[in-house]
Amino acid sequence: MADGKAGEEKPEKSQRAGAAGGPEEEAEKPVKTKTVSSSNGGESSSRSAEKRSAEEEAVDLPTKPTKISKFGFAIGSQTTKKASAISIKLGSSKPKETVPTLAPKTLSVAAAFNEDEDSEPEEMPPEAKMRMKNIGRDTPTSAGPNSFNKGKHGFSDNQKLWERNIKSHLGNVHDQDN
């Protein structure tokens, strides 16, 4: 039984050290593993049942909810302090900024829509003028969705165009034979 008491004291000392060390150390300490051998089914021959039950009880004493609550309270207190500091700073700066920003915005909007200053008409660049002309297949507009059947000569039916070419060639060949 003296060995059992010594085994019980060691986990308690490690628990006290973990509590003094902080929440990070507490999370690492309570994990305990047993050596497993295949010959005796996971039980160590040198350890008695009393020693194992005493150590398991000592490990079960610290509960996880207490650790989580300590950690949760630490985070909660930090966030409330930061939120109050931020709200005070924004509250004091809001009235000063709103008054000056309204006056220049109204002046800039009025100046933007003032038509008296723009007496000369806007000039179009030559590239834009060229794009607006619809000259054959090579214009950018021929690639649009409404330009499906467009060729070099504008909108035309390719089948009809092929028939016309055949007729003209037949007419040329017939004229050459005569």
From Swiss-Prot:
Skewed-composition ranges (Low complexity): 37-47
Positions bearing Phosphothreonine: 139
Biased composition (Polar residues): 139-149
Modified residues (N-acetylalanine): 2
Protein name (database record): PEST proteolytic signal-containing nuclear protein
Primary location class: nucleus
PTM description: Ubiquitinated; mediated by UHRF2 and leading to its subsequent proteasomal degradation. N-terminally acetylated in a HYPK-dependent manner by the NatA acetyltransferase complex which is composed of NAA10 and NAA15.
Subunit-level organization: Interacts with UHRF2/NIRF.
Positions of the UniProt region annotated as Disordered: 1-84, 134-178
GO biological process terms held by the UniProt record: proteasome-mediated ubiquitin-dependent protein catabolic process; protein ubiquitination
Record's subcellular location: Nucleus
Keyword terms: Acetylation, Cell cycle, Nucleus, Phosphoprotein, Ubl conjugation
UniProt keyword annotation of Phosphoprotein present: yes
Alphabetical list of InterPro entries matching this protein: PCNP
Keyword Cell membrane among record annotations: no
Modified residues (Phosphoserine): 53, 77, 87, 119, 147
Composition bias type Basic and acidic residues, residue spans: 1-15, 160-178
Residues passing through the membrane, by range: none
Chain positions with N6-acetyllysine modification: 64, 150, 152
Role this protein plays: May be involved in cell cycle regulation.
GO cellular component labels: nuclear body
Classification of source organism: Eukaryota, Metazoa, Chordata, Craniata, Vertebrata
